[in-house]
Every structure is written in structure tokens, then in C-alpha cells.
Regions:
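Cytosolic, long alpha-helical scaffolding segments
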Residues: 1-237
């Protein structure tokens, strides 16, 4: 009976891991497509990004239901319980990453397609590449329960913040130089902030991995270098 229970619990954990991996892959694709849509002012692709978020949301709900049901049925303790709590936390962060990609896509739909700030866009592309690397590496660390790799992601967040700070100053300069730039620059400010927040969620996942493996919350303060005053306000029609 005990062996059967253990096998059933292992199957539950494997199914949660599979759903987390699928969710992570979808979130990564959303980010890449959102950046492409922003670069090309491609409203059709932006709408695809918005529509794709429904699957990410659905997976998050399935993971939540599965994890809670498993806790209720199996009454796990110690590392087994932390694995389930970790799955809940990671799925929540991935769902938020998907929402942030969707917010960028929503802005693409209303941005002026005639204006372009190539230097700023290169900075946004660079920050997106950094964040995608963070997400890929932290998901690999989650799958392997690799604390050392998770901590590399945790420390890398400062570089993302530094790029965001630079973009913030640059966009403010463009707005002060020419009022015609204000609308576009405002949208790009929020796009950059959304990407920076994705990095924060990758850092959250790194902290969750530490908790899952070590059994306690990471004691050190998070390395933050974000000095912008822009808050993350989702764009809504």
C-alpha cells in the first residue's frame, strides 16, 4: 500500500513538472513574439500574443488545482511539501510573466507606427535577451533542483536593472527634446518596465528553488539596481 502511495505521489510530481515546463515554454514564446511585434509594429502578431495568454492562464489554474489536491490527498511533509509549494509559486510567477508579455502586445496595438527610436529598441532587445536567458536558466535550475544555477540567475538581475535604468533616462531625454515623442516614449517606458519585471519574476523562481532545496528562505537581500520611478501599470483599452 505504501509503495502504491509513493508511486502515485511521484506521478503527481511528474505531472506538475511537465505542466511547469510547458508553461515556461509558452511564456518564453510570448516574450519573443511580443518583442517581434514591438519591433515591427505588427498588430496581428500582437493579437496572437494576447490570445496565447489564455493557455498560460489555464495551465496555472490546472497546476494550482493539482498541487492543492495532492497536498490534501497525500498530506506530504518536509521536502515533498516544499516541492508542491514550489510548483504553486513557480506557476504564479510564470503566469505573471505571460501577463507582462500580453501588456506589451496591447501597447503595440495602439502605438504610432511612423515613429521609431532605433537606439532605444536595441536596448529593449538587449534587455529582453537577458531576461529570456534568465528564464531559460532558472527553469532548467528548477527541473534539476540546481541551487547554484538558481543563484546565478538571482545575481544576474542587477544587469537587467542597469539596462532598464539606462533606457529610462534615455527615454526621458527624448521626451524633453521633442514633445512629439512623448506618446511613443511613454509606451516604450512601460514596455521596458514590463520586461524588467519579468526578470524580477525569474528571480522569484530562483528564490523558490533555494527554498525547495534548502528548506528555508534565502536570507540575503535581493540585488536590485532599479532606480526608475515608473510603476508597472498594465495597458488597458
Amino acid at each position: 500500500m505504501m509503495e502504491h502511495t509513493l508511486k502515485a505521489f511521484d506521478a503527481d510530481l511528474q505531472e506538475l513538472a511537465r505542466m511547469i515546463a510547458e508553461m515556461g515554454g509558452l511564456a518564453e514564446r510570448q516574450i519573443g513574439d511580443a518583442l517581434d511585434a514591438l519591433n515591427r509594429r505588427d498588430t496581428a502578431l500582437a493579437r496572437d500574443v494576447i490570445a496565447a495568454d489564455a493557455r498560460v492562464d489555464s495551465l496555472q489554474r490546472q497546476i494550482e488545482e493539482k498541487a492543492i489536491l495532492t497536498i490534501a490527498r497525500r498530506q506530504p511533509m518536509a521536502v515533498d511539501l516544499r516541492d508542491l509549494v514550489g510548483a504553486l509559486r513557480v506557476s504564479n510567477d510564470l503566469e505573471r510573466i505571460g501577463d507582462l508579455a500580453k501588456n506589451i502586445a496591447k501597447r503595440v496595438e495602439v502605438m504610432d507606427s511612423e515613429l521609431s527610436l532605433q537606439k532605444v529598441m536595441r536596448g529593449i532587445e538587449h534587455m529582453t535577451e537577458l531576461v529570456l536567458t534568465q528564464i531559460k536558466e532558472v527553469l532548467d535550475a528548477y527541473a534539476r533542483r540546481d541551487v547554484a544555477k538558481a543563484m546565478q540567475v538571482w545575481r544576474a538581475d542587477e544587469e537587467v536593472d542597469a539596462v532598464n535604468n539606462s533606457l529610462f533616462r534615455e527615454l526621458l531625454t527624448y521626451m524633453m527634446e521633442d514633445p512629439r515623442n512623448i506618446s511613443l516614449c511613454t509606451h516604450l517606458l512601460f514596455c521596458a518596465k514590463n520586461i524588467e519585471r519579468m526578470g524580477d519574476h525569474a528571480t522569484n523562481i530562483a528564490e523558490t528553488i533555494y527554498y525547495m532545496v534548502e528548506g528555508y528562505i534565502l536570507p540575503d537581500d535581493r540585488p536590485k539596481g532599479d532606480h526608475t520611478s515608473t510603476t508597472n501599470i498594465p495597458y488597458r483599452n
